[in-house]
Amino acid sequence: MASSKAFGWAAKDASGHLSPFHFTRRQNEADDVTLKILYCGVCHSDLHTVKNDWGFTTYPVVPGHEIAGIVTKVGSNVTKFKEGDRVGVGVIVDSCQECECCQQDLESYCPKPVFTYNSPYKGTRTQGGYSDFVVVHQRFVLQFPDNLPLDAGAPLLCAGITVYSPMKYYGMTEPGKHLGVAGLGGLGHVAIKFGKAFGLKVTVISSSPNKESEAIDVLGADSFLLSSDPEKMKAATGTMDYIIDTISAVHSLVSLLGLLKLNGKLVTVGLPSKPLQLPIFPLVAGRKLIGGSNFGGLKETQEMLDFCGKHNIAANIELIKMDEINTAIERLSKADVKYRFVIDVANSLSSSNM
């Protein structure tokens, strides 16, 4: 297969340290869209992958699956996009397109996904958005609404859809209902914004008292519940209709279940490193539901982007240069970011030190 020279930053071993890296991309074919990458969000998955925390990283690896940019070339069969379009690429760049999941526009649940980076694909391996350009099948390219900024919109392609999809699927959108958002990070801060746009009462549940002002005054939550205060947790028993749990650290589910009303729903989207204990009694006694969710399919992700454009929803970001990525990864490991790092790829990659 013909290829084109590309440039980005890659991790070359499990130290997770990223450095400049020359590699090749496949050339644009009939169904492909080539985009110049302007911005790329920094996701927790990037951190886990560069350090091989999940045990399946193949080095060298260029991370990044929150990609926003401009179309520079389209293949002869491409009808949805044209040069100059503002577009994005999320977590996957291909799927089998034949299974039941793919036929239902749920490519994120396909048993044979091709991830945007670190996946075998057509005799090579995919590389992500910490780079100058990418070539993607048109089915896996998303259109940005004109009023949605590319830099603050990029994290929506993973963090945004990861909370939007379960809120829609599990019916956590009824105006006037009470939503608890457990954890205030990259996922949680977007969940607050979606909740308010759906007309919900939103309470942030966090063990960090210093996050109260940020949750209410900056992000627009209605209230704050300090989960490390037993008395406040007891007082909030049975007050919430839904909880979306974005916490990635090991934590108690029983305390969250106690906050739910009869028929309440707890949906987990965080990925703790160790299994959580599942308490059955409160599920049975309160006819409560606990569920999970992956990121959404392409149709739903486009719906989410359009929703964000309509309601002026974007991530709160800290824009960084490409050569600041190692510091950003270290800070991310300590949850030291409000609330998503985004790399200013187009304005900093070419000037990165070799």
From Swiss-Prot:
It catalyses: D-mannitol + NAD(+) = D-mannose + NADH + H(+). InterPro entries: ADH-like_C, ADH-like_N, ADH_Zn_CS, CAD-like, GroES-like_sf, NAD(P)-bd_dom_sf, PKS_ER. It comes from the Eukaryota. One of its GO terms (molecular function) is mannitol dehydrogenase activity. It is an enzyme of class 1 (oxidoreductase). It holds the Pfam family ADH_zinc_N. Its EC number is 1.1.1.255. PROSITE patterns: ADH_ZINC (PS00059). Keywords: Metal-binding, NAD, Oxidoreductase, Zinc. Zn(2+) 1 binds at C43, H65, C158. One of its GO terms (biological process) is lignin biosynthetic process. Oxidizes mannitol to mannose. Provides the initial step by which translocated mannitol is committed to central metabolism and, by regulating mannitol pool size, is important in regulating salt tolerance at the cellular level. Belongs to the zinc-containing alcohol dehydrogenase family. This is Probable mannitol dehydrogenase 1. The gene is CAD1.
